[in-house]
């Protein structure tokens, strides 16, 4: 009865600590300066998580300062940081005027709306056409963030705000801006990423189609591909009676299919427009085109957008029954996840691999999973940090014996001396636990065995909260917050069951190793996820309960972890179904002298 209120009160205590730091201009400025001076991307992520949780409580001036800081982060060399910063910019614009505000008289225009839209227009200009003093690579990083900002803003904003923000964005396609090269490419890439229903409202559809068609003959190959790719998406919303149907058909006929990639896009456009696709089908599915695509995708000179389309082309080959190269295609996708320079290509390859996983045989699945696992063990975090998201889901296609083997190897990696390897192993366990409910549908096991494996995964994650390295503890906090209690995939009843089992242990471990300033931000974010879960479950599911210990045993005297007989006795009692409590007194052990607090940690 005390555990749940304690979590809520402790979350309140952490909120007060963080809000106190955000409350005054001086302290808020100090936080931004500390975040700007951080070199380690994981520490930067702690600040981003904190802003993500508390940005709605900031005043307008603080929001402007935060958006300015996030814009600077778009230059960061870490793709994950750029993506997270971009999504947060979109969220802050969507919620710019949200929160508790004074009620205005009727018919009085809101001056804050004008401020938000003016700021939005200003930043759109800086995103599409960055400062000329930046290097080409820095400009590309900023321009590439445009789509993540737009998608985040459109997803999170209300209908009224969404229309206002999108209306400002669409002005870039009215023909008044003389755009060439990269700005055109990234605008087209942004349109490709946005919801189709938003792009097809009113006369926007024709405007966007004309913009795409006008750049189909661009001398730059990547702009051509981007324009045709946008046309492929927009033609899904063009019925035969539409005013722009003839325009789209004429443009589709004008596409020069000089490469297999352009031919594939033309085939998809013809399909959307209900045109005859016999000639395209003959080339695509009548000949072996897979080996040429493999070669093209592994070339560093190939534009990333070409690789992205080729990934869909390879998956399409399998969908049309060409299974001869299935293992090679999946192995190719796993290689792209591990070595591709462009983050977007890695995610496209990962999604395609998961889509085809069910077609592989057991041996083939195991082969791919082992290759991905080897990628974790490399220790090059720049390459391995994108693997957990896909290895965690892919491993759930393995039969029980092989899945247990993967979990055991991840368990071994948690003891690695390299913090980066521990972090990716921990992330993989988080994804495994988050998606584990799918496993019981694919492989029939007794409920007892299935539940035991789930508890093992949870136990491995919790064990990292007791790690002696603060960075590992922070990663464990992140996994518990995002992959368990903040998950959109896990069912509420599964969260409740896990909470009832780990609540007391979690409460103790969170309080035991409080860490420094950055750990406060990680802990506050995790407690926010737990608090939201508790509130949601109590509102719709009933009371959140914690499990009680039926059989308890106290180990007499001082427990010595360096003595195998002590450990053996404790394990034996535990196997009998008892929860064993160990005592550590103030005196040193006889075999290995250590200070009291160090022994407590062990």
Describe each model-derived feature in a short phrase.
Residues 20-29, 59-70, 112-124, 158-169, ...:
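Core helices of alpha-solenoid repeat scaffolds
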Residues 4-8, 43, 47, 85, ...:
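Conserved hydrophobic register position within alpha-solenoid helical repeats
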Residues 245, 249-282, 289-295, 299-316, ...:
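Core solenoid repeat modules with strong leucine/isoleucine-rich periodicity
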Residues 15, 58, 77, 96, ...:
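Long alpha-helical scaffolds in large eukaryotic adaptor/regulatory proteins
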Residues 2, 37, 41-42, 79-80, ...:
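Alpha-helix N-cap/helix-start positions at coil->helix boundaries
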Residues 12-13, 51-56, 89-97, 146-153, ...:
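Hydrophobic residues within the alpha-helices of tandem HEAT/HEAT-like
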Residues 447-448, 454, 458, 470-473, ...:
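Nucleotidyltransferase catalytic core that binds NTPs
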Residues 28-39, 68-75, 109, 121-133, ...:
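HEAT/HEAT-like alpha-solenoid repeats
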């Amino acid at each position: 009865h005390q555990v749940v209120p304690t979590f809520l009160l402790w979350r309140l205590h952490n909120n007060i600590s963080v809000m106190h730091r955000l409350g005054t201009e001086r302290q808020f400025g100090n936080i931004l300066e500390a975040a700007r001076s951080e070199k380690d991307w994981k520490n930067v992520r702690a600040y981003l998580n904190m802003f993500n949780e508390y940005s709605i409580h900031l005043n307008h001036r603080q929001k402007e300062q935060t958006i300015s800081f996030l814009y600077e982060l778009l230059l960061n060399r870490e793709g994950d940081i750029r993506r997270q910063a971009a999504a947060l910019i979109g969220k802050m614009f969507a919620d710019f005027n949200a929160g508790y505000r004074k009620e205005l008289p009727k018919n009085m225009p809101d001056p804050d709306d004008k401020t938000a839209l003016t700021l939005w227009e200003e930043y759109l200009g800086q995103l599409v056409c960055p400062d000329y003093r930046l290097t080409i690579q820095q400009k590309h990083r900023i321009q590439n963030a445009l789509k993540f900002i737009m998608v985040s803003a459109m997803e999170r904003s209300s209908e009224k705000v969404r229309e206002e923000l999108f209306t400002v964005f669409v002005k870039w396609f009215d023909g008044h801006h003389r755009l060439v090269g990269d700005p055109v490419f990234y605008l087209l890439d942004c349109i490709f990423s946005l919801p189709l229903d938003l792009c097809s409202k009113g006369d926007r559809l024709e405007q966007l189609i004309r913009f795409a068609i006008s750049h189909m003959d661009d001398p730059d190959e990547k702009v051509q591909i981007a324009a045709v790719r946008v046309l492929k998406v927009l033609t899904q919303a063009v019925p035969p009676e539409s005013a722009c149907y003839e325009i789209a058909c004429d443009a589709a006929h004008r596409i020069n299919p000089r490469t297999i990639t352009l031919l594939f896009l033309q085939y998809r456009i013809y399909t959307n427009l209900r045109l005859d696709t016999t000639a395209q089908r003959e080339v695509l599915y009548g000949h072996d085109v897979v080996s040429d695509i493999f070669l093209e995708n592994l070339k560093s000179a190939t534009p990333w957008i070409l690789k992205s389309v080729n990934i869909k082309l390879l998956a399409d080959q399998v969908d049309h029954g060409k299974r001869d190269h299935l293992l090679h295609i999946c192995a190719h996708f796993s290689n792209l996840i591990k070595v591709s320079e462009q983050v977007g290509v890695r995610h496209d390859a990962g999604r395609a691999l998961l889509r085809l996983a069910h077609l592989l045989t057991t041996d083939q699945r195991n082969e791919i999973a082992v290759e991905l696992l080897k990628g974790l063990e490399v220790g090059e975090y720049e390459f391995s940090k994108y693997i957990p998201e896909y290895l965690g889901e892919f491993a759930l296609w393995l039969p029980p014996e092989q899945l247990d083997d993967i979990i055991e190897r991840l368990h071994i990696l948690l003891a690695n001396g390299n913090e980066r390897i521990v972090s990716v192993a921990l992330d993989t366990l988080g994804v495994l636990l988050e998606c584990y409910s799918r496993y019981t549908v694919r492989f029939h096991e007794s409920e007892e065995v299935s539940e035991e494996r789930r508890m093992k995964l949870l136990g491995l994650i919790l064990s990292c909260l007791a790690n002696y390295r603060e960075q590992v503890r922070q990663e464990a906090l992140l996994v518990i917050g995002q992959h368990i209690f903040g998950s959109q995939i896990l069912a509420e009843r599964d969260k409740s069951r896990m909470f009832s089992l780990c609540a007391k242990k979690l409460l103790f471990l969170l309080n035991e190793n409080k860490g420094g300033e950055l750990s406060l931000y990680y802990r506050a974010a995790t407690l926010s996820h737990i608090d939201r879960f508790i509130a949601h479950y109590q509102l719709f599911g009933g009371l959140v309960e914690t499990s009680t210990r039926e059989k308890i045993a106290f180990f007499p005297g001082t427990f010595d972890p360096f003595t195998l007989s002590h450990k053996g006795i404790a394990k034996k009692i535990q196997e009998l179904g008892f929860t064993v409590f160990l005592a550590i007194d103030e005196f040193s052990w006889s075999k290995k002298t250590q200070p009291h607090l160090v022994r407590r940690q062990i």
